[in-house]
From Swiss-Prot:
Keywords: ATP-binding, Cell membrane, Membrane, Nucleotide-binding, Phosphonate transport, Translocase, Transport. One of its GO terms (cellular component) is plasma membrane. The keyword Nucleotide-binding applies. GO terms for molecular function: ABC-type phosphonate transporter activity; ATP binding; ATP hydrolysis activity. The complex is composed of two ATP-binding proteins (PhnC), two transmembrane proteins (PhnE) and a solute-binding protein (PhnD). It is an enzyme of class 7 (translocase). InterPro entries: AAA+_ATPase, ABC_transporter-like_ATP-bd, ABC_transporter-like_CS, ABC_transpr_PhnC, MetN_ABC_transporter-like, P-loop_NTPase. It is a peripheral membrane protein. This is Phosphonates import ATP-binding protein PhnC. Residues 2-246 form the ABC transporter domain. The gene is phnC. ATP binds at residues 35-42.
Length: 257
């Protein structure tokens, strides 16, 4: 379980990114967070593995505080958290296989991983992960030779090879076309269902949130304004999440597509 206890985040310029967040996400859930740009979705997501440090409160993972973790303990906890970024976050000039093997870095010494000395068991894990997302034939291609959708599937394979217990996906389909968007979200959903990996995804699309989520969390101005099952996420609730009544009809048109 991931638990946020009275979590707040204030940026150096005084902007409040998160305001007293209290939230529990159970093991194996597939949660989608929605809201306007700047609502706090990315800040909340990235605070889980401390890419963003919180100002107040505490974040617990399986009853252990990642907020208080240091050194080896922090590295161990981060090893269980796979991150998928909008920009893919791949080493473009490296092969797909090497990018997937980056998911194994947390299991070995810095010297060993710098030299690329991964054991054959790790290489086999990487191949299995690539096969899982239907991109095994690209193992020895350079990452920058791949389409955007293929690169994002490499990111998913990296998280699988990492043997992550939690996957955090920050706007993973923002730059992808509709067909590729479906492929990437289908992959994430299937992995969640087959392996029980707790998955949190940030999205802008109301329609996609309704299609894929089992639970939707809506953020507005750094606060949770909705938290419930898909069935409870009515058009009116989405209008509240997005906060502008004048845009309500536009939002509902998007949701209907």
């Amino acid at each position: 379980m991931i638990e946020f206890r009275n979590v707040s985040k204030v940026y150096p310029n005084g902007t409040k990114g998160l305001n007293n967040i209290n939230l529990k996400i159970q093991k194996g859930e597939f949660v989608i967070m929605v809201g306007l740009s700047g609502a706090g979705k990315s800040t909340l997501l990235k605070s889980v593995n401390r890419l963003h440090e919180i100002t107040e409160g505490e974040i617990m993972i399986e009853c252990e505080s990642i907020t208080a973790a240091k050194g080896k303990d922090l590295r161990r906890m981060r090893r269980d958290i796979g991150m998928i970024f909008q920009s893919f976050n791949l080493v473009k000039r490296s092969t797909v296989l090497k990018n997937v093997l980056a998911g194994r870095v947390g299991y070995h010494s810095t010297l060993r991983t710098t030299l690329g000395l991964f054991p054959k068991e790790d290489v086999e894990l990487a191949f299995q992960a690539l096969k899982r997302v239907n991109i095994l034939e690209k193992a020895y291609a350079r990452a920058d030779e791949l389409s955007g959708g293929q690169q994002q599937r490499v990111s998913i394979a990296r998280a699988l090879a990492q043997e992550a217990k939690i996957i955090l996906a920050d706007e993973p389909v923002a730059s992808l076309d509709p067909l590729t968007t479906k492929q990437v979200l289908d992959d994430l959903k299937k992995i969640n269902e087959d392996f029980g990996i707790t998955t949190i995804v940030n999205l802008h699309s109301i329609a996609l949130a309704r299609q894929y989520a089992t639970r939707i969390i809506g953020l507005h101005a750094g606060e949770i304004v909705f938290d419930g099952l898909v069935e409870a996420a009515t058009d009116e609730k989405f209008a509240e999440i997005y906060g502008d009544v004048a845009q309500k009809s536009e939002l509902l048109e998007v949701a209907a597509k």
